[in-house]
Design a protein with these regions (language model features):
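Conserved glycine-rich cofactor-binding loop
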Residues: 12-13
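Residue(s) in the substrate-gating loop at a strand-loop-helix junction
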Residues: 128
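SDR active-site lid
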Residues: 161-201
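Substrate-binding pocket helix/loop in short-chain dehydrogenase/reductase
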Residues: 84-85, 92-94
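Active-site helix of classical SDR
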Residues: 108, 144-147
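The beta1-alpha1 cofactor-binding region of Rossmann-like NAD(H)/NADP(H)-dependent oxidoreductases
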Residues: 48-58, 90
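Conserved glycine-rich Rossmann-like NAD(P)H-binding loop of the short-chain dehydrogenase/reductase
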Residues: 26-41
């Protein structure tokens, strides 16, 4: 992987940070994108919001102006919502899809043409074990990751003839700040006999 240019979204914490640092240790030039103002020491940080196409476009243009190529893209940016479906607003569900699914879509729409024209590239989309094994009271999170899996399989077949490989990684629970940062909707826990709070503890 030496001398390759890698881009990691959500690269300032958790899995994204660990991935970005591992790529750097492997010899890659790494750009990590997040909404935070400050990034990780030793990595190139660009403040960007994956839910905004213009923000993603500007970030990719900045990387291309500096490096002239992108060899690896890791779509890691995401968050979680927990709660019963009947007490989770449609707006909350949409915001989850905006980041976990359409954030990935926005990045890929900018990077795929670059990799296709170069004739090589690797795209890694962060999914979850919650995609094949949906988790009660994390219904919408599970749905976003199932969408990531379906999208990944289709995109892999689209891009294979151009030398671009696409895969999804499905981690289980990992000791990061992700669970603590999850947006928790506890309404209706009494109706569900405490199952909501127990399932997301």
């Amino acid at each position: 992987m030496s001398n390759k240019v890698a881009v990691v979204t959500g690269g300032t914490s958790g899995i994204g940070r660990a991935t970005a640092l591992a790529l750097k240790d492997a010899g890659c030039t790494v750009y990590e994108l997040s909404r935070r103002v400050q990034g990780v020491e030793g990595l190139h940080h660009i403040s960007a919001d994956v839910t905004r196409e213009e923000s993603v476009r500007a970030a990719v243009e900045q990387i291309m102006a500096r490096e002239g190529r992108i060899d690896i893209l890791v779509n890691n940016a995401g968050f979680g919502i927990s709660g019963a479906v009947e007490f989770t607003s449609t707006e909350d569900a949409k915001s989850l899809f905006d980041v976990n699914f359409f954030g990935m879509v926005n990045m890929n729409r900018q990077v795929v043409p670059i990799m296709r024209e170069a004739g090589h590239g690797r795209i890694v989309n962060l999914s979850s074990v919650a995609a094949p094994v949906p988790i009660p009271f994390q219904t919408y999170y599970s749905a976003t990751k199932a969408a990531v899996n379906a999208y990944t399989m289709a995109l892999a077949n689209e891009l294979r003839p151009f030398g671009v490989t696409v895969c999804a990684v499905m981690p289980g629970d990992i000791h990061t700040g992700f669970t603590a940062a999850r947006r928790k909707i506890g309404e209706g826990d009494d109706i569900y006999q405490g199952r909501i709070s127990r399932s997301v503890a």
